[in-house]
Amino acid sequence: MAISAPAACSSSSRILCSYSSPSPSLCPAISTSGKLKTLTLSSSFLPSYSLTTTSASQSTRRSFTVRAARGKFERKKPHVNIGTIGHVDHGKTTLTAALTMALASIGSSVAKKYDEIDAAPEERARGITINTATVEYETENRHYAHVDCPGHADYVKNMITGAAQMDGAILVVSGADGPMPQTKEHILLAKQVGVPDMVVFLNKEDQVDDAELLELVELEVRELLSSYEFNGDDIPIISGSALLAVETLTENPKVKRGDNKWVDKIYELMDAVDDYIPIPQRQTELPFLLAVEDVFSITGRGTVATGRVERGTVKVGETVDLVGLRETRSYTVTGVEMFQKILDEALAGDNVGLLLRGIQKADIQRGMVLAKPGSITPHTKFEAIIYVLKKEEGGRHSPFFAGYRPQFYMRTTDVTGKVTKIMNDKDEESKMVMPGDRVKIVVELIVPVACEQGMRFAIREGGKTVGAGVIGTILE
Protein backbone atom coordinates (compact mmCIF):
# COMPACT_ATOMS: atom_id res chain seq x y z
CA MET A 1 0.00 0.00 0.00
CA ALA A 2 1.44 3.32 -0.94
CA ILE A 3 1.43 5.20 2.29
CA SER A 4 4.73 4.46 3.93
CA ALA A 5 6.94 7.21 2.70
CA PRO A 6 9.41 5.36 0.51
CA ALA A 7 6.65 3.42 -1.19
CA ALA A 8 4.53 6.49 -1.65
CA CYS A 9 7.33 8.27 -3.37
CA SER A 10 8.47 5.42 -5.49
CA SER A 11 5.11 4.61 -6.97
CA SER A 12 4.37 8.23 -7.83
CA SER A 13 7.82 8.82 -9.21
CA ARG A 14 7.58 5.67 -11.25
CA ILE A 15 4.46 6.95 -13.03
CA LEU A 16 6.19 10.18 -13.87
CA CYS A 17 9.33 8.56 -15.14
CA SER A 18 7.90 5.80 -17.22
CA TYR A 19 5.37 7.96 -19.02
CA SER A 20 7.26 11.27 -18.93
CA SER A 21 3.91 13.03 -18.82
CA PRO A 22 4.20 16.80 -18.93
CA SER A 23 0.96 17.11 -16.99
CA PRO A 24 1.57 19.18 -13.87
CA SER A 25 -1.38 17.51 -12.19
CA LEU A 26 0.72 14.42 -11.49
CA CYS A 27 3.52 16.28 -9.84
CA PRO A 28 2.00 16.87 -6.40
CA ALA A 29 2.13 13.13 -5.84
CA ILE A 30 5.89 13.37 -5.28
CA SER A 31 6.51 13.62 -1.60
CA THR A 32 9.84 15.36 -1.32
CA SER A 33 12.78 15.97 -3.56
CA GLY A 34 14.96 15.28 -0.58
CA LYS A 35 13.98 11.63 -0.96
CA LEU A 36 14.44 11.21 -4.66
CA LYS A 37 17.95 10.00 -4.05
CA THR A 38 16.48 6.85 -2.53
CA LEU A 39 14.48 6.19 -5.65
CA THR A 40 17.06 6.93 -8.27
CA LEU A 41 17.91 3.35 -9.12
CA SER A 42 14.51 1.86 -8.36
CA SER A 43 13.73 -1.01 -10.68
CA SER A 44 11.26 0.78 -12.96
CA PHE A 45 13.71 3.58 -13.67
CA LEU A 46 16.55 1.63 -15.17
CA PRO A 47 15.18 0.66 -18.58
CA SER A 48 14.54 4.32 -19.38
CA TYR A 49 18.24 5.16 -19.75
CA SER A 50 21.52 3.30 -19.91
CA LEU A 51 23.38 3.43 -16.65
CA THR A 52 26.76 1.89 -16.06
CA THR A 53 28.51 3.29 -13.05
CA THR A 54 26.82 6.58 -12.33
CA SER A 55 26.71 7.82 -8.78
CA ALA A 56 23.34 8.34 -7.13
CA SER A 57 23.57 12.12 -7.43
CA GLN A 58 24.43 12.03 -11.13
CA SER A 59 21.56 9.72 -11.98
CA THR A 60 19.12 11.86 -10.02
CA ARG A 61 20.17 14.80 -12.15
CA ARG A 62 19.96 12.83 -15.35
CA SER A 63 16.53 11.31 -14.81
CA PHE A 64 14.90 14.51 -13.64
CA THR A 65 16.74 17.16 -15.64
CA VAL A 66 13.87 18.28 -17.83
CA ARG A 67 11.36 18.43 -15.04
CA ALA A 68 13.61 20.15 -12.54
CA ALA A 69 14.27 22.87 -15.09
CA ARG A 70 10.51 23.40 -15.37
CA GLY A 71 10.18 23.71 -11.62
CA LYS A 72 8.02 20.63 -11.15
CA PHE A 73 10.26 18.87 -8.65
CA GLU A 74 11.11 21.81 -6.46
CA ARG A 75 9.28 20.37 -3.48
CA LYS A 76 11.95 20.52 -0.81
CA LYS A 77 9.64 19.61 2.05
CA PRO A 78 10.26 16.53 4.17
CA HIS A 79 7.54 13.86 4.09
CA VAL A 80 5.73 12.63 7.20
CA ASN A 81 3.02 9.97 7.53
CA ILE A 82 0.33 10.67 10.11
CA GLY A 83 -3.12 9.38 10.93
CA THR A 84 -6.17 10.16 13.03
CA ILE A 85 -6.95 7.72 15.85
CA GLY A 86 -9.62 7.71 18.57
CA HIS A 87 -13.06 6.47 19.64
CA VAL A 88 -15.88 5.94 17.16
CA ASP A 89 -17.93 9.12 16.45
CA HIS A 90 -15.47 11.45 18.18
CA GLY A 91 -14.85 13.18 14.83
CA LYS A 92 -11.76 11.62 13.22
CA THR A 93 -13.06 11.73 9.65
CA THR A 94 -14.63 15.20 10.11
CA LEU A 95 -11.25 16.46 11.36
CA THR A 96 -9.49 14.88 8.36
CA ALA A 97 -11.94 16.73 6.07
CA ALA A 98 -11.37 20.00 7.98
CA LEU A 99 -7.58 19.65 7.61
CA THR A 100 -7.74 19.18 3.83
CA MET A 101 -10.25 22.04 3.43
CA ALA A 102 -8.31 24.50 5.60
CA LEU A 103 -5.02 23.77 3.84
CA ALA A 104 -6.77 23.86 0.43
CA SER A 105 -7.79 27.44 1.21
CA ILE A 106 -4.09 28.39 1.17
CA GLY A 107 -3.35 26.18 -1.85
CA SER A 108 -1.55 23.39 0.03
CA SER A 109 -4.10 20.62 -0.35
CA VAL A 110 -7.05 19.31 -2.33
CA ALA A 111 -10.24 19.67 -0.26
CA LYS A 112 -11.93 16.36 0.52
CA LYS A 113 -15.51 16.07 1.76
CA TYR A 114 -16.47 13.79 4.64
CA ASP A 115 -18.16 11.21 2.41
CA GLU A 116 -15.13 11.07 0.06
CA ILE A 117 -12.95 10.07 3.02
CA ASP A 118 -15.54 7.86 4.71
CA ALA A 119 -16.03 5.66 1.62
CA ALA A 120 -12.54 4.29 2.11
CA PRO A 121 -11.20 1.94 -0.57
CA GLU A 122 -10.15 -1.56 0.37
CA GLU A 123 -6.45 -2.29 0.58
CA ARG A 124 -4.68 -5.56 1.20
CA ALA A 125 -1.70 -6.01 3.48
CA ARG A 126 -0.27 -9.39 4.48
CA GLY A 127 -3.37 -11.07 3.07
CA ILE A 128 -5.77 -8.95 5.13
CA THR A 129 -8.38 -6.60 3.68
CA ILE A 130 -8.37 -3.14 5.28
CA ASN A 131 -10.46 -0.08 4.56
CA THR A 132 -8.21 2.98 4.71
CA ALA A 133 -8.56 6.42 3.19
CA THR A 134 -5.41 8.40 2.49
CA VAL A 135 -5.33 12.11 1.81
CA GLU A 136 -2.32 14.33 1.30
CA TYR A 137 -1.70 17.94 2.18
CA GLU A 138 1.11 20.37 2.94
CA THR A 139 1.95 22.89 5.60
CA GLU A 140 4.62 25.55 5.12
CA ASN A 141 7.28 23.15 6.36
CA ARG A 142 6.17 19.63 5.44
CA HIS A 143 4.28 17.32 3.12
CA TYR A 144 1.90 14.89 4.84
CA ALA A 145 0.20 11.64 3.89
CA HIS A 146 -2.72 11.23 6.27
CA VAL A 147 -4.55 7.94 6.85
CA ASP A 148 -8.07 7.69 8.23
CA CYS A 149 -9.89 4.37 8.77
CA PRO A 150 -13.68 4.18 8.88
CA GLY A 151 -14.05 1.23 11.25
CA HIS A 152 -12.42 0.31 14.55
CA ALA A 153 -11.40 -3.12 13.23
CA ASP A 154 -9.73 -1.38 10.27
CA TYR A 155 -7.54 0.66 12.66
CA VAL A 156 -6.48 -2.47 14.51
CA LYS A 157 -5.65 -4.30 11.26
CA ASN A 158 -3.95 -1.26 9.70
CA MET A 159 -1.70 -0.62 12.68
CA ILE A 160 -0.73 -4.27 13.17
CA THR A 161 0.00 -5.02 9.49
CA GLY A 162 1.75 -1.66 9.03
CA ALA A 163 -0.22 -1.16 5.82
CA ALA A 164 -0.13 2.56 6.54
CA GLN A 165 2.89 3.23 8.71
CA MET A 166 2.44 6.22 10.98
CA ASP A 167 5.32 8.50 11.96
CA GLY A 168 2.91 10.19 14.36
CA ALA A 169 -0.79 10.37 15.16
CA ILE A 170 -3.52 12.89 15.91
CA LEU A 171 -5.59 11.50 18.77
CA VAL A 172 -9.15 12.82 18.50
CA VAL A 173 -11.13 12.97 21.76
CA SER A 174 -14.61 14.44 22.10
CA GLY A 175 -14.47 17.27 24.65
CA ALA A 176 -18.09 16.50 25.49
CA ASP A 177 -17.48 12.80 26.27
CA GLY A 178 -13.83 12.52 27.28
CA PRO A 179 -11.71 9.38 26.70
CA MET A 180 -13.73 6.25 25.87
CA PRO A 181 -12.81 2.53 25.54
CA GLN A 182 -11.53 2.75 21.94
CA THR A 183 -9.54 5.89 22.85
CA LYS A 184 -7.63 3.73 25.31
CA GLU A 185 -7.32 0.81 22.90
CA HIS A 186 -5.93 3.03 20.11
CA ILE A 187 -3.39 4.64 22.47
CA LEU A 188 -2.28 1.20 23.66
CA LEU A 189 -2.08 -0.08 20.10
CA ALA A 190 -0.08 2.99 19.02
CA LYS A 191 2.38 2.27 21.83
CA GLN A 192 2.61 -1.43 21.01
CA VAL A 193 3.26 -0.99 17.29
CA GLY A 194 5.74 1.86 17.78
CA VAL A 195 3.92 5.07 16.79
CA PRO A 196 6.48 7.41 18.37
CA ASP A 197 4.53 10.62 19.02
CA MET A 198 1.05 12.06 18.99
CA VAL A 199 -0.81 15.36 19.24
CA VAL A 200 -4.33 15.61 20.71
CA PHE A 201 -7.38 17.38 19.26
CA LEU A 202 -10.22 17.89 21.76
CA ASN A 203 -13.15 18.00 19.38
CA LYS A 204 -16.74 19.26 19.83
CA GLU A 205 -15.62 22.23 21.97
CA ASP A 206 -18.82 24.02 20.87
CA GLN A 207 -20.86 21.42 22.78
CA VAL A 208 -19.08 22.12 26.09
CA ASP A 209 -20.53 25.11 27.95
CA ASP A 210 -18.16 24.98 30.90
CA ALA A 211 -14.48 25.76 30.27
CA GLU A 212 -13.57 23.89 33.48
CA LEU A 213 -15.11 20.72 32.07
CA LEU A 214 -12.82 20.97 29.03
CA GLU A 215 -9.83 21.40 31.35
CA LEU A 216 -10.85 18.25 33.23
CA VAL A 217 -11.05 16.29 29.98
CA GLU A 218 -7.60 17.61 29.01
CA LEU A 219 -6.22 16.50 32.38
CA GLU A 220 -7.79 13.06 31.96
CA VAL A 221 -6.28 12.69 28.47
CA ARG A 222 -2.81 13.69 29.74
CA GLU A 223 -3.02 11.15 32.58
CA LEU A 224 -4.19 8.46 30.16
CA LEU A 225 -1.31 9.16 27.75
CA SER A 226 1.21 9.10 30.61
CA SER A 227 -0.20 5.75 31.81
CA TYR A 228 0.72 4.31 28.39
CA GLU A 229 4.24 5.81 28.57
CA PHE A 230 3.66 8.70 26.19
CA ASN A 231 4.87 12.10 27.38
CA GLY A 232 1.44 13.19 28.67
CA ASP A 233 2.69 16.39 30.30
CA ASP A 234 4.24 17.80 27.13
CA ILE A 235 1.95 16.55 24.34
CA PRO A 236 0.20 19.51 22.68
CA ILE A 237 -3.59 19.49 23.17
CA ILE A 238 -5.67 21.77 20.94
CA SER A 239 -9.41 22.13 21.40
CA GLY A 240 -11.81 23.07 18.62
CA SER A 241 -14.74 21.95 16.51
CA ALA A 242 -13.97 20.07 13.31
CA LEU A 243 -17.63 20.24 12.24
CA LEU A 244 -17.89 24.03 12.61
CA ALA A 245 -14.59 24.42 10.74
CA VAL A 246 -15.93 22.24 7.89
CA GLU A 247 -19.21 24.21 7.79
CA THR A 248 -17.34 27.53 7.69
CA LEU A 249 -15.02 26.33 4.92
CA THR A 250 -17.93 24.87 2.95
CA GLU A 251 -19.68 28.28 2.98
CA ASN A 252 -16.48 30.15 2.17
CA PRO A 253 -13.52 28.02 0.96
CA LYS A 254 -11.25 31.10 0.97
CA VAL A 255 -11.32 31.66 4.75
CA LYS A 256 -7.83 32.80 5.79
CA ARG A 257 -5.97 32.41 9.06
CA GLY A 258 -7.35 34.94 11.53
CA ASP A 259 -10.80 35.16 9.90
CA ASN A 260 -12.59 32.47 11.90
CA LYS A 261 -12.03 30.98 15.37
CA TRP A 262 -12.81 27.38 14.37
CA VAL A 263 -10.70 27.38 11.20
CA ASP A 264 -7.83 28.93 13.17
CA LYS A 265 -7.99 25.95 15.57
CA ILE A 266 -7.30 23.65 12.60
CA TYR A 267 -4.22 25.72 11.65
CA GLU A 268 -3.15 25.68 15.30
CA LEU A 269 -3.41 21.87 15.29
CA MET A 270 -1.20 21.59 12.19
CA ASP A 271 1.33 24.01 13.72
CA ALA A 272 1.50 21.64 16.71
CA VAL A 273 1.92 18.60 14.43
CA ASP A 274 4.70 20.43 12.53
CA ASP A 275 6.49 21.33 15.76
CA TYR A 276 5.94 18.24 17.90
CA ILE A 277 6.04 15.23 15.58
CA PRO A 278 9.68 14.80 14.48
CA ILE A 279 10.68 14.04 10.90
CA PRO A 280 11.41 10.29 10.85
CA GLN A 281 14.83 8.95 10.05
CA ARG A 282 14.71 7.86 6.43
CA GLN A 283 15.54 4.36 5.32
CA THR A 284 18.82 5.25 3.56
CA GLU A 285 20.35 6.44 6.85
CA LEU A 286 19.69 3.16 8.66
CA PRO A 287 22.03 0.11 8.70
CA PHE A 288 21.93 -1.92 5.47
CA LEU A 289 19.53 -4.86 5.21
CA LEU A 290 18.42 -7.01 2.27
CA ALA A 291 16.13 -10.05 2.61
CA VAL A 292 17.32 -12.75 0.21
CA GLU A 293 14.64 -13.73 -2.32
CA ASP A 294 16.64 -15.87 -4.73
CA VAL A 295 20.16 -17.26 -5.21
CA PHE A 296 22.05 -18.30 -8.33
CA SER A 297 25.61 -18.98 -9.45
CA ILE A 298 27.55 -17.21 -12.18
CA THR A 299 30.28 -19.54 -13.47
CA GLY A 300 33.70 -18.10 -12.81
CA ARG A 301 32.37 -15.15 -10.81
CA GLY A 302 30.63 -16.53 -7.74
CA THR A 303 27.24 -16.56 -6.06
CA VAL A 304 24.60 -13.85 -6.46
CA ALA A 305 21.88 -13.16 -3.88
CA THR A 306 18.93 -11.11 -5.13
CA GLY A 307 16.33 -9.12 -3.23
CA ARG A 308 15.07 -5.67 -2.39
CA VAL A 309 17.19 -3.41 -0.20
CA GLU A 310 14.91 -2.80 2.78
CA ARG A 311 17.04 -0.06 4.30
CA GLY A 312 20.47 1.54 4.15
CA THR A 313 23.02 1.37 1.35
CA VAL A 314 25.70 -1.14 0.32
CA LYS A 315 28.81 -0.50 -1.79
CA VAL A 316 31.16 -2.82 -3.65
CA GLY A 317 33.95 -3.95 -1.32
CA GLU A 318 31.89 -3.75 1.87
CA THR A 319 31.47 -6.67 4.26
CA VAL A 320 27.97 -7.97 5.06
CA ASP A 321 26.64 -10.54 7.53
CA LEU A 322 24.51 -13.44 6.30
CA VAL A 323 21.97 -13.92 9.11
CA GLY A 324 19.23 -16.43 9.89
CA LEU A 325 18.39 -20.15 9.49
CA ARG A 326 22.05 -21.10 10.05
CA GLU A 327 25.14 -19.76 11.81
CA THR A 328 25.89 -16.09 11.00
CA ARG A 329 28.85 -15.57 8.63
CA SER A 330 30.48 -12.55 6.97
CA TYR A 331 31.16 -12.10 3.26
CA THR A 332 32.50 -9.38 0.97
CA VAL A 333 30.30 -7.81 -1.70
CA THR A 334 32.30 -7.93 -4.96
CA GLY A 335 29.58 -6.62 -7.27
CA VAL A 336 26.21 -4.85 -7.26
CA GLU A 337 23.94 -5.29 -10.29
CA MET A 338 20.44 -4.32 -11.30
CA PHE A 339 18.87 -5.28 -14.65
CA GLN A 340 22.28 -6.32 -16.02
CA LYS A 341 23.69 -2.89 -15.15
CA ILE A 342 26.64 -2.51 -12.78
CA LEU A 343 26.23 -0.09 -9.86
CA ASP A 344 28.66 1.39 -7.35
CA GLU A 345 26.12 1.10 -4.57
CA ALA A 346 22.58 -0.08 -3.92
CA LEU A 347 20.12 2.12 -2.04
CA ALA A 348 16.99 1.41 0.01
CA GLY A 349 14.19 0.44 -2.36
CA ASP A 350 16.42 -1.03 -5.08
CA ASN A 351 15.88 -4.57 -6.37
CA VAL A 352 19.44 -5.80 -6.80
CA GLY A 353 21.74 -8.77 -7.13
CA LEU A 354 24.77 -8.81 -4.82
CA LEU A 355 27.77 -10.84 -5.91
CA LEU A 356 29.41 -12.40 -2.84
CA ARG A 357 32.96 -13.71 -2.51
CA GLY A 358 33.77 -17.12 -1.04
CA ILE A 359 30.29 -18.57 -0.71
CA GLN A 360 28.67 -21.56 -2.40
CA LYS A 361 25.09 -21.50 -3.65
CA ALA A 362 24.22 -24.24 -1.14
CA ASP A 363 25.29 -21.99 1.77
CA ILE A 364 22.67 -19.31 1.17
CA GLN A 365 18.92 -19.59 0.77
CA ARG A 366 15.73 -17.57 0.54
CA GLY A 367 14.70 -16.21 3.93
CA MET A 368 18.20 -15.31 5.12
CA VAL A 369 19.13 -11.63 5.27
CA LEU A 370 22.28 -9.78 4.27
CA ALA A 371 22.94 -6.95 6.69
CA LYS A 372 25.54 -4.52 8.01
CA PRO A 373 27.78 -6.54 10.36
CA GLY A 374 26.40 -6.61 13.90
CA SER A 375 23.19 -4.75 13.06
CA ILE A 376 20.78 -7.69 13.35
CA THR A 377 20.92 -11.08 15.06
CA PRO A 378 18.94 -14.33 14.68
CA HIS A 379 16.31 -15.19 17.30
CA THR A 380 13.91 -18.03 18.04
CA LYS A 381 11.60 -16.60 20.72
CA PHE A 382 9.64 -13.36 20.85
CA GLU A 383 6.51 -11.71 22.20
CA ALA A 384 4.15 -10.21 19.61
CA ILE A 385 0.82 -8.43 19.25
CA ILE A 386 -1.39 -10.25 16.75
CA TYR A 387 -4.76 -9.76 15.10
CA VAL A 388 -6.60 -12.97 14.21
CA LEU A 389 -8.84 -12.82 11.17
CA LYS A 390 -12.55 -13.50 11.52
CA LYS A 391 -14.26 -16.23 9.53
CA GLU A 392 -15.84 -13.53 7.27
CA GLU A 393 -12.35 -12.16 6.54
CA GLY A 394 -11.16 -15.55 5.32
CA GLY A 395 -9.66 -16.55 8.65
CA ARG A 396 -10.19 -19.49 10.98
CA HIS A 397 -13.67 -20.69 11.89
CA SER A 398 -12.63 -21.88 15.34
CA PRO A 399 -10.45 -20.65 18.23
CA PHE A 400 -6.87 -21.78 18.81
CA PHE A 401 -5.04 -22.53 22.03
CA ALA A 402 -1.49 -22.46 23.41
CA GLY A 403 0.50 -25.08 21.50
CA TYR A 404 -0.89 -23.94 18.12
CA ARG A 405 1.77 -24.38 15.36
CA PRO A 406 1.15 -22.23 12.26
CA GLN A 407 3.65 -20.81 9.74
CA PHE A 408 5.10 -17.36 10.43
CA TYR A 409 5.91 -15.36 7.28
CA MET A 410 8.70 -12.84 7.98
CA ARG A 411 10.21 -10.86 5.13
CA THR A 412 11.00 -13.60 2.59
CA THR A 413 10.95 -16.58 4.92
CA ASP A 414 8.22 -18.81 6.27
CA VAL A 415 9.04 -20.82 9.34
CA THR A 416 6.97 -22.98 11.66
CA GLY A 417 6.52 -21.61 15.15
CA LYS A 418 4.71 -22.68 18.30
CA VAL A 419 2.43 -20.33 20.25
CA THR A 420 3.58 -21.06 23.81
CA LYS A 421 1.62 -18.40 25.71
CA ILE A 422 -1.46 -16.21 25.12
CA MET A 423 -2.06 -12.95 27.07
CA ASN A 424 -4.58 -10.11 27.14
CA ASP A 425 -3.80 -6.35 27.32
CA LYS A 426 -3.19 -6.58 31.07
CA ASP A 427 -0.65 -9.37 30.53
CA GLU A 428 -2.99 -11.88 32.18
CA GLU A 429 -2.71 -15.34 30.69
CA SER A 430 -5.59 -16.39 28.43
CA LYS A 431 -6.64 -19.91 27.50
CA MET A 432 -7.67 -19.37 23.87
CA VAL A 433 -7.85 -16.93 20.96
CA MET A 434 -11.08 -16.40 19.05
CA PRO A 435 -11.22 -15.25 15.40
CA GLY A 436 -11.38 -11.41 15.47
CA ASP A 437 -9.31 -11.12 18.68
CA ARG A 438 -6.27 -8.91 19.21
CA VAL A 439 -3.94 -10.53 21.72
CA LYS A 440 -0.35 -10.80 22.87
CA ILE A 441 1.40 -14.13 22.27
CA VAL A 442 4.80 -15.71 22.86
CA VAL A 443 6.19 -17.58 19.83
CA GLU A 444 9.02 -20.11 19.62
CA LEU A 445 10.37 -20.69 16.09
CA ILE A 446 11.87 -24.04 15.08
CA VAL A 447 14.90 -22.33 13.47
CA PRO A 448 16.54 -18.95 14.22
CA VAL A 449 15.42 -16.08 11.98
CA ALA A 450 16.78 -12.53 11.65
CA CYS A 451 14.07 -10.57 13.44
CA GLU A 452 13.81 -7.38 15.45
CA GLN A 453 11.40 -5.34 17.51
CA GLY A 454 8.73 -3.67 15.37
CA MET A 455 9.03 -6.24 12.57
CA ARG A 456 5.73 -7.35 11.06
CA PHE A 457 4.70 -10.81 9.99
CA ALA A 458 1.75 -12.81 8.69
CA ILE A 459 0.43 -16.01 10.25
CA ARG A 460 -0.59 -18.68 7.77
CA GLU A 461 -2.12 -22.11 8.06
CA GLY A 462 -3.05 -24.49 5.26
CA GLY A 463 -2.16 -21.99 2.56
CA LYS A 464 -4.28 -19.12 3.85
CA THR A 465 -3.59 -16.08 6.04
CA VAL A 466 -5.19 -16.42 9.46
CA GLY A 467 -3.63 -13.40 11.18
CA ALA A 468 -0.94 -10.74 11.27
CA GLY A 469 1.35 -9.46 13.95
CA VAL A 470 4.14 -7.17 15.01
CA ILE A 471 7.06 -8.19 17.26
CA GLY A 472 6.98 -6.36 20.59
CA THR A 473 9.89 -7.89 22.53
CA ILE A 474 12.67 -10.29 21.55
CA LEU A 475 13.01 -12.92 24.27
CA GLU A 476 15.87 -15.13 23.00
From Swiss-Prot:
Q: Which GO terms describe its molecular function?
A: GTP binding; GTPase activity; mRNA binding; translation elongation factor activity
Query: Which residues get modified to Phosphothreonine?
Result: 94
The residues the record assigns to binding GTP are 86-93, 148-152, 203-206
tr-type G domain ranges (all copies): 77-281
Keyword tags: Chloroplast, Elongation factor, GTP-binding, Nucleotide-binding, Phosphoprotein, Plastid, Protein biosynthesis, Transit peptide
Subunit info here reads: Interacts with PI5K2. Interacts with APD2.
The free-text function statement in the UniProt record for this protein reads:
This protein promotes the GTP-dependent binding of aminoacyl-tRNA to the A-site of ribosomes during protein biosynthesis.
Family affiliation: Belongs to the TRAFAC class translation factor GTPase superfamily. Classic translation factor GTPase family. EF-Tu/EF-1A subfamily.
Q: What is the protein name for this chain? A: Elongation factor Tu, chloroplastic
Encoding gene per record:
TUFA
